[in-house]
């Protein structure tokens, strides 16, 4: 399995809502990352399996540019990939696991679907909450989590790690049935 977390490179974006994919991978493994031309990567053991972690080094909207290089490097196919990214339409504390689907308006996922030529890509969408009324969407997704939101997010990351283990052991359908209805609260 190759877990691809989406985000924007650089310290300016490091802790923003839009970088929740990168943040999750850092939760799984905070050090010992290696860098290729188009992506950073590391490996972990999860449920007894070797799992590659990948952060595209392009900006979010160009995430797909890294994907052919990721597939070649890991000798993988689109079926081996699970993409983790933010979803403004999901409440903070919720995740949505899917086996396939459209980009749902997410430009990073849109770029990956275009690059791989298929919508049949597993994904975990991570709720980042509703933007406050009157706030620009870009300002919201490029804003940082509050201290209270971090408490929830760290619990969400624990749940997501469990969900990945279920995907590895029992399959995506089983993980969907367990985790898509859960809501993490403080």
Curated annotation (Swiss-Prot):
Site (described: Stabilizes the basic form of H active site to accept a proton): 86
UniProt-annotated location(s): Cytoplasm
Enzyme Commission number(s): 3.1.1.29
Sites marked Discriminates between blocked and unblocked aminoacyl-tRNA: 8
Catalytic activity: an N-acyl-L-alpha-aminoacyl-tRNA + H2O = an N-acyl-L-amino acid + a tRNA + H(+)
Record keyword Transport present: no
Molecular function terms, GO-annotated: peptidyl-tRNA hydrolase activity; tRNA binding
GO biological process, one term: protein quality control for misfolded or incompletely synthesized proteins
Keyword Cytoplasm assigned: yes
Keywords tagged on the record: Cytoplasm, Hydrolase, RNA-binding, tRNA-binding
GO cellular component, one term: cytoplasm
Active site: 18 (proton acceptor)
InterPro entries xrefs: Pept_tRNA_hydro, Pept_tRNA_hydro_CS, Pept_tRNA_hydro_sf
One matching Pfam family: Pept_tRNA_hydro
Chief place of localization: cytoplasm
Sites where the protein binds tRNA: 13, 59, 61, 107
Position of the signal peptide: none
Family per similarity comment: Belongs to the PTH family.
Subunit composition and interactions: Monomer.
NCBIfam families registered for this protein in UniProt: pth (TIGR00447)
Function: Hydrolyzes ribosome-free peptidyl-tRNAs (with 1 or more amino acids incorporated), which drop off the ribosome during protein synthesis, or as a result of ribosome stalling. Catalyzes the release of premature peptidyl moieties from peptidyl-tRNA molecules trapped in stalled 50S ribosomal subunits, and thus maintains levels of free tRNAs and 50S ribosomes.
The protein's name: Peptidyl-tRNA hydrolase
Protein source organism: Thermotoga petrophila (strain ATCC BAA-488 / DSM 13995 / JCM 10881 / RKU-1)
Gene: pth
